[in-house]
């Protein structure tokens, strides 16, 4: 089991949580981005740099992740592809995507895109709160514990 990160848009505070967890649990962590990233020296943490372009990092994550892996992303279509492949997906605010929630989120995303295309100002998400960070850490820990139980 491995953790993949859609790293271009992932907040640094979330990356720090992931770095500590990967080292503590000896879980392979790969950050995929189209720009250079700084990561701490660790045999469990690596970066994978991809070409610039629309969905290039997302496509690489989908190509390389396996059933049972965890993907950290706020990208709803990427999360949907990961779930379809048998993986788990968690956003940086600590929301674990499910088959039911992903359909709802895709519908809302499409609706908001339609509004923006028609000129409506929809605004962006709130900044990451302390509660969001705690929720993320708790959900990550749940996934790590479930993996440990499955591996015996």
UniProtKB/Swiss-Prot annotation:
List, alphabetically, the Pfam families matched: DUF188
The protein's name in its UniProt record: UPF0178 protein KPN78578_03210
Q: Of which family is this protein a member? A: Belongs to the UPF0178 family.
The organism's place on the tree of life at top rank: Bacteria
Ranges in coiled-coil conformation: none
Q: Organism source for this protein?
A: Klebsiella pneumoniae subsp. pneumoniae (strain ATCC 700721 / MGH 78578)
CDD domains, from UniProt?
PIN_YqxD-like
């Amino acid at each position: 089991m491995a953790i993949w990160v859609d790293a271009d848009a992932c907040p640094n505070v979330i990356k720090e949580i992931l770095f500590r967890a990967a080292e503590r649990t000896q879980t392979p962590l790969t950050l995929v981005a189209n720009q250079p990233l700084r990561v701490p020296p660790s045999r469990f943490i690596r970066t994978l740099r991809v070409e610039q372009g629309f969905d290039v990092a997302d496509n690489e994550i989908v190509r390389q992740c396996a059933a049972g892996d965890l993907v950290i992303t706020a990208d709803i279509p990427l999360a949907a592809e990961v779930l379809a492949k048998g993986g788990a997906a968690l956003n940086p605010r600590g929301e674990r995507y499910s088959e039911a929630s992903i359909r709802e989120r895709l519908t809302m995303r499409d609706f908001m895109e339609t509004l923006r295309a028609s000129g409506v100002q929809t605004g962006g998400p709130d900044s990451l709160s302390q509660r969001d960070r705690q929720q993320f850490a708790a959900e990550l820990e749940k996934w790590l514990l479930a993996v440990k139980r499955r591996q015996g």
